[in-house]
Amino acid sequence: MAEVLKGKPVADALKAELTKNIEALKKDKGITPKLGIIRVGARPDDLFYEGGAKKTCAAVGMDCEIFEYPEDIDQASFEKAVTEVGAKKDVNGILMFSPLPKNLDERKIRTLIPVEKDVDCLTTGGAAKVFTDDATGFPPCTPTACMEMLHFYDIPIKGKKCVVVGRSLVVGKPLAMLLLREHGTVTICHSRTENLPGVCQDADILIAAVGRAKMVKADFVKKGQIVIDVGINADPDRPGKYCGDVDFETVEPVVTKITPVPAGVGSVTTSVLCKQTFMACQMQNA
């Protein structure tokens, strides 16, 4: 039986440290960090994450402001709105939910978010900082949450074979960069990789971030491995439930350590979002 690596203890530790740091910032400089959330429409997934972010902000003593716009907002009006949010001096970090409605040019709108307030790597400038090892850039929250999980559970990365299944700019590619920073030997693969199960079996640390329910099965893994499951998918076998990219029931008996879905990496992301907003606030007020 594998050790199941839950996300809650990681999130709790991050929040405890962040609460102390925010209290110190308030005392020393009279500044309260603020997260600004930009949302168009009211998709249930966006509202769910927004609720979690607001709750985490409140728990650590951080302000949070929601900037909500109708789904039929036009391009010019939304560009003006995003520019105004970006210019607010009291907003230190910005999260914008995507995808935006099809009538909006999302690529152009992302350029309007100030890079120094881009706490979820939405902008090209933010991504450039991550991929050039610029410490003033913020990686997306999900890959950062993966790294927080590895650190909290004292899982060594240096010299280890790290296989990332998934090549998105949201998780796979930035996660590979974060693992490389800590001297992991990284392989990025995807659903079309030749002999994907064999490549995955060669890993010391296997991270599934491909967005396919239960794709990673027992023949992808071996004894001694650590498996981090980033996926969040509708469970094809249990209507109304969620599952990861890993078939937990068949993989868990084989490997040494594994994260569950839900209650794994996903439960750490809002704490990371708040941490990166605090860091942005520090840099803006240095």
Swiss-Prot record:
<keyword id="KW-0521">NADP</keyword>
<protein>
    <recommendedName>
        <fullName>Bifunctional protein FolD</fullName>
        <ecNumber>1.5.1.5</ecNumber>
        <ecNumber>3.5.4.9</ecNumber>
    </recommendedName>
</protein>
<keyword id="KW-0560">Oxidoreductase</keyword>
<dbReference type="InterPro" id="IPR046346">
    <property type="entry name" value="Aminoacid_DH-like_N_sf"/>
</dbReference>
<keyword id="KW-0511">Multifunctional enzyme</keyword>
<keyword id="KW-0368">Histidine biosynthesis</keyword>
<dbReference type="InterPro" id="IPR020631">
    <property type="entry name" value="THF_DH/CycHdrlase_NAD-bd_dom"/>
</dbReference>
<dbReference type="GO" id="GO:0005829">
    <property type="term" value="C:cytosol"/>
</dbReference>
<dbReference type="GO" id="GO:0000105">
    <property type="term" value="P:L-histidine biosynthetic process"/>
</dbReference>
<dbReference type="InterPro" id="IPR020630">
    <property type="entry name" value="THF_DH/CycHdrlase_cat_dom"/>
</dbReference>
<dbReference type="GO" id="GO:0004488">
    <property type="term" value="F:methylenetetrahydrofolate dehydrogenase (NADP+) activity"/>
</dbReference>
<comment type="similarity">
    <text>Belongs to the tetrahydrofolate dehydrogenase/cyclohydrolase family.</text>
</comment>
<dbReference type="GO" id="GO:0035999">
    <property type="term" value="P:tetrahydrofolate interconversion"/>
</dbReference>
<feature type="binding site">
    <location>
        <position position="232"/>
    </location>
    <ligand>
        <name>NADP(+)</name>
    </ligand>
</feature>
<feature type="binding site">
    <location>
        <begin position="166"/>
        <end position="168"/>
    </location>
    <ligand>
        <name>NADP(+)</name>
    </ligand>
</feature>
<dbReference type="GO" id="GO:0006164">
    <property type="term" value="P:purine nucleotide biosynthetic process"/>
</dbReference>
<keyword id="KW-0486">Methionine biosynthesis</keyword>
<dbReference type="InterPro" id="IPR000672">
    <property type="entry name" value="THF_DH/CycHdrlase"/>
</dbReference>
<keyword id="KW-0554">One-carbon metabolism</keyword>
<comment type="pathway">
    <text>One-carbon metabolism; tetrahydrofolate interconversion.</text>
</comment>
<dbReference type="GO" id="GO:0004477">
    <property type="term" value="F:methenyltetrahydrofolate cyclohydrolase activity"/>
</dbReference>
<dbReference type="Pfam" id="PF00763">
    <property type="entry name" value="THF_DHG_CYH"/>
</dbReference>
<dbReference type="InterPro" id="IPR036291">
    <property type="entry name" value="NAD(P)-bd_dom_sf"/>
</dbReference>
<keyword id="KW-0378">Hydrolase</keyword>
<dbReference type="Pfam" id="PF02882">
    <property type="entry name" value="THF_DHG_CYH_C"/>
</dbReference>
<keyword id="KW-0658">Purine biosynthesis</keyword>
<comment type="subunit">
    <text>Homodimer.</text>
</comment>
<feature type="binding site">
    <location>
        <position position="191"/>
    </location>
    <ligand>
        <name>NADP(+)</name>
    </ligand>
</feature>
<dbReference type="GO" id="GO:0009086">
    <property type="term" value="P:methionine biosynthetic process"/>
</dbReference>
<keyword id="KW-0028">Amino-acid biosynthesis</keyword>
<comment type="function">
    <text>Catalyzes the oxidation of 5,10-methylenetetrahydrofolate to 5,10-methenyltetrahydrofolate and then the hydrolysis of 5,10-methenyltetrahydrofolate to 10-formyltetrahydrofolate.</text>
</comment>
